[in-house]
C-alpha cells in the first residue's frame, strides 16, 4: 500500500493502475477507521482491481459547534487496518491541498430535496460540505465505482442524486451497516460514549426493529407508531433529535401504501449524536 498526500501523486498512481487495465474502486473516509470501514474496503476489492481510500476530516461539513477539533485522528492505526483490508493506495490530503483558495472561496454544491430535513435540518450546511468534498474526491480519483455505508442513509441518497444529476461516470454502491454484537451501528463517534451511555446505545436499533415489525404487521398510524418509538428511546435514556419514516429514494415522508420504507433516527446520548436506520420492505 502506498500513501500519497497530493492530488498530483494521487492522479499519477491511479493513471498507472488504469494503464494496466485495472478497475478502480474508491472508499472515502474521515479516518478513525473501524470494522465497518474495513468491510467497505474489502468489498471494494471484490468489485475492483485497485482500491483507493481517502482519509480527510472535511471542515466544510462540520458546523461551528460540532466536533471537528476533537474528531479522532488515528493515521498509524488506520494505515495498518487498511493494509489488512486490501487497500492499494491511501490519499491523505491536507486542508490546504483540498481547498487551496481557502474554504470561504470554495465553490460549493447544493443537492436539493434529499439534503433537506433529517440531518440536513439539524446540521445546516452539512450536506453542502459532503457534496462538495465528495465531488472533488470523485474528480480527483475518477474511480469506476465508489462505496459508502448505508448507516449514513441520507448521505448516500445525497451522493446518489449528486452523481445522477451531474452525470458523473461512477457507479455508487451502498453497503449494509456493520453492527456490534448488541446491534449498535459501528461509528467513529461511539468512542465518545462512556460506559453507561454505551450500555444504553443499543436501544436505538432495538427501537428501530420494533417499529419495523409493527409496520410489517400492518400498522398504518405512522404518527402514533413514531410517538411510541420516541417514548421508548427516551425511557432508555436517549434524547431523540428526529425519528421519521421516509420513502427511501426521494426521502419524502412515507405514507401507508408505500411498499418500500426506511426509518431514520438521530438521538443524543449526552453530547454524542448517533444515527441509524432500518429499511422496511413490504413486498
Curated annotation (Swiss-Prot):
Record-linked InterPro entries: Cyt_trans-like, Pantoate_ligase, Pantoate_ligase_C, Rossmann-like_a/b/a_fold
Presence of the UniProt keyword Manganese in the record: no
EC numbers on record: 6.3.2.1
EC category: ligase
Catalytic residues identified in the record: 37
Locations listed in the record: Cytoplasm
Pathway named in the protein's UniProt entry: Cofactor biosynthesis; (R)-pantothenate biosynthesis; (R)-pantothenate from (R)-pantoate and beta-alanine: step 1/1
Binding locations of beta-alanine: 61
Cited Pfam families: Pantoate_ligase
GO biological processes: pantothenate biosynthetic process
Subunit field text: Homodimer.
Functional note: Catalyzes the condensation of pantoate with beta-alanine in an ATP-dependent reaction via a pantoyl-adenylate intermediate.
Family under the similarity heading: Belongs to the pantothenate synthetase family.
Note: The reaction proceeds by a bi uni uni bi ping pong mechanism.
Name of this chain's protein: Pantothenate synthetase
Gene: panC
Amino acid at each position: 500500500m502506498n500513501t500519497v498526500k497530493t492530488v498530483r501523486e494521487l492522479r499519477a498512481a491511479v493513471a498507472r493502475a488504469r494503464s494496466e487495465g485495472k478497475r478502480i474502486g474508491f472508499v472515502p473516509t474521515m479516518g478513525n477507521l473501524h470494522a465497518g470501514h474495513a468491510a467497505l474496503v474489502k468489498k471494494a476489492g471484490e468489485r475492483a482491481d485497485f482500491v483507493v481510500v481517502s482519509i480527510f476530516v472535511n471542515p466544510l461539513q462540520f458546523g461551528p459547534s460540532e466536533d471537528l477539533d476533537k474528531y479522532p485522528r488515528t493515521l498509524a492505526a488506520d494505515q495498518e487496518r487498511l493494509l489488512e483490508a486490501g487497500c492499494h493506495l491511501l490519499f491523505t490530503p491536507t486542508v490546504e491541498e483540498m481547498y487551496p483558495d481557502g474554504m470561504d472561496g470554495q465553490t460549493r454544491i447544493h443537492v436539493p430535496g434529499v439534503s433537506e430535513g433529517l440531518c440536513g435540518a439539524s446540521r445546516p450546511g452539512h450536506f453542502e460540505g459532503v457534496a462538495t468534498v465528495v465531488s472533488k474526491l470523485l474528480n480527483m480519483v475518477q474511480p469506476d465505482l465508489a462505496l459508502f455505508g448505508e448507516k449514513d442513509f441520507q448521505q448516500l441518497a445525497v451522493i446518489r442524486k449528486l452523481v445522477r444529476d451531474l452525470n458523473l461516470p461512477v457507479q455508487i454502491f451502498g453497503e449494509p451497516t456493520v453492527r456490534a454484537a448488541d446491534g449498535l451501528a459501528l461509528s467513529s463517534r461511539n468512542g465518545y460514549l462512556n460506559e453507561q451511555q454505551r450500555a444504553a446505545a443499543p436501544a436505538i436499533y432495538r427501537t428501530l426493529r420494533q417499529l419495523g415489525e409493527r409496520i410489517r404487521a400492518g400498522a398504518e398510524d405512522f404518527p402514533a407508531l413514531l410517538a411510541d418509538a420516541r417514548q421508548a428511546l427516551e425511557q432508555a435514556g436517549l434524547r431523540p433529535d428526529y425519528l421519521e419514516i421516509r420513502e427511501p429514494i426521494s426521502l419524502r415522508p412515507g405514507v401507508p401504501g408505500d411498499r418500500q420504507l426506511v426509518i431514520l433516527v438521530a438521538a443524543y446520548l449526552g453530547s454524542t449524536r448517533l444515527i441509524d436506520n432500518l429499511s422496511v420492505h413490504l413486498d
